[in-house]
């Protein structure tokens, strides 16, 4: 068996100490015995990934990682697999998080500019290859032994965990302090423009030593982000203020582009020309060890389809009483959400019974999506309803009901007069309403 034997993995990597772990993966320090190079190995539990419905996403993301070879991006060296595990062999970045520096005090302007230049060049490189990060945050900004910035988790977001450290700049798990207004809004967004916003928040933090959008009241902080309400400290010079106003523009259509940022005089001061000249075409593809059961990515026994896992921001955005879209635009009233302490199988069974009673054709899709369709056309065609189940914890789920076709009034009538009463036994709370009991769900 090619899997880990003792301290050796694939007869090539000497495994070291555990560096961290999350829901799907553990990360170990390791040494390549052929080159003596220090690496990090992310060991992923294939069964958990399959149950979470994330295998296709991981395979797509492995392919995109071939496109993102850049000196300021944590490198994926190799992908291997066995019948039970997937292994990502990654560059080991030894300098820790950039924000550990900021916790000791704000950075001088030249130092902040250097890191911002490296960040922008790395992110722009990925954008040029059609890859967007969408989750730039403190944990993803690392430093190597030469104090150069390294952006991590490009292309590996499916395995990102929401666990964060407490501290000056690490906000509560899921707090969208670095997230663009349009992402909070959940109405679809341009990945490039969302990344630009996050880069602006990071620049502010480097120069100020604190977040631009912060409030003890979470909802007030959401509002500040939505309106881009922030104040620059007195030590910010005019050029930085102007640049930040262009980056932290709540309207993505008028927000500054990467090209314009890179033309900005403040940005270009002292810029290392090698960053701009970096060859965008990688010379080598990432080696994938096909002899170690990579083809068995899909060969595991058939598993019950489980609902999608929500990341922490999704939980906050979708959970009871926190419908954020109303802060930015009028709701079209086509969707409703409720939370439940029932198991996923119980929720699915209940929805199947409701669909049968309403004579709706029900189709199960991957990741906890149930599609229902009427048998007869109504005023605006055949009514279509999606029910999507998200796992917050094994004992707590969020369900989103959404009209996908047909007349809105007809849908609201079916929802309020038929579906809601039938769902009452499994509903903990409908979004915007108080839970039927004050008992908190088990997390």
From Swiss-Prot:
Enzyme class per UniProt: transferase
Highest taxon of source: Eukaryota
Domain Protein kinase: 13-267
Record EC number: 2.7.11.1
Region PPI, annotated ranges: 333-362
A Pfam match: NAF
Region of interest: Activation loop: 153-182
Protein name as catalogued: CBL-interacting protein kinase 2
Taxonomic lineage: Eukaryota, Viridiplantae, Streptophyta, Embryophyta, Tracheophyta
């Amino acid at each position: 068996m090619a899997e880990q034997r003792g301290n050796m993995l694939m007869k090539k990597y000497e495994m070291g100490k555990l560096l961290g772990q999350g829901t799907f993966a553990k990360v170990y320090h390791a040494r390549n015995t052929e080159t003596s190079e220090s690496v990090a190995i992310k060991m992923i539990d294939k069964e958990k990934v399959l149950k979470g419905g994330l295998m296709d996403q991981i395979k797509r993301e492995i392919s995109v990682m071939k496109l993102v070879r850049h000196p300021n991006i944590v490198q994926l060296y190799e992908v291997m697999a066995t019948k039970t595990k997937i292994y990502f062999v990654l560059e080991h970045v030894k300098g820790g998080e950039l924000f550990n520096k900021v916790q000791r005090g704000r950075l001088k302007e030249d130092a902040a500019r250097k890191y911002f230049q490296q960040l922008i060049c790395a992110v722009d490189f990925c954008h040029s290859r059609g890859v967007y990060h969408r989750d730039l945050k403190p944990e993803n900004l690392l430093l190597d032994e030469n104090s150069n910035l390294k952006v991590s988790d490009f292309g590996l977001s499916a395995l990102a965990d929401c666990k964060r450290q407490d501290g000056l700049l690490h906000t509560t798990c899921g707090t969208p302090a670095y997230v663009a207004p349009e992402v909070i809004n959940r109405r679809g967004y341009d990945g490039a423009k969302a990344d630009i916003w996050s880069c602006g928040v990071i620049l502010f933090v480097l120069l100020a030593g604190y977040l631009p959008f912060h409030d003890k009241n979470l909802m007030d902080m959401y509002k500040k982000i939505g309106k881009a309400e922030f104040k620059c400290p007195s030590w910010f010079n005019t050029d930085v203020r102007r640049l930040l106003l262009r980056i932290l523009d709540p309207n993505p259509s008028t927000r500054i582009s990467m090209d314009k940022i890179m033309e900005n005089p403040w940005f270009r001061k002292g810029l290392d020309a090698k960053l701009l000249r970096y060859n965008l075409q990688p010379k080598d593809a990432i080696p994938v060890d096909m002899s170690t059961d990579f083809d068995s990515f899909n060969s595991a026994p058939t598993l019950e389809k489980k609902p999608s896992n929500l990341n922490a921001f999704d939980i906050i955005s979708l959970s009871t009483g926190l419908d954020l879209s109303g802060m930015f635009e009028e709701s079209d009233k086509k969707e409703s959400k409720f939370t439940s302490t029932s198991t996923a199988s119980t929720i699915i069974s209940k929805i199947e019974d409701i669909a049968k009673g309403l004579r709706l054709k029900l189709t199960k899709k991957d990741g906890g999506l149930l599609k229902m369709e009427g048998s007869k056309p109504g005023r605006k065609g055949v009514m279509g309803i999606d029910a999507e189940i998200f796992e917050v914890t094994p004992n707590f789920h969020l369900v989103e009901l959404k009209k996908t076709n047909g007349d809105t009034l007809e849908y609201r009538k079916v929802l309020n007069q038929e579906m809601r009463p039938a769902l009452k036994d499994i509903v903990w709370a409908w979004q915007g309403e108080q839970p039927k009991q004050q008992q908190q769900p088990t997390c």
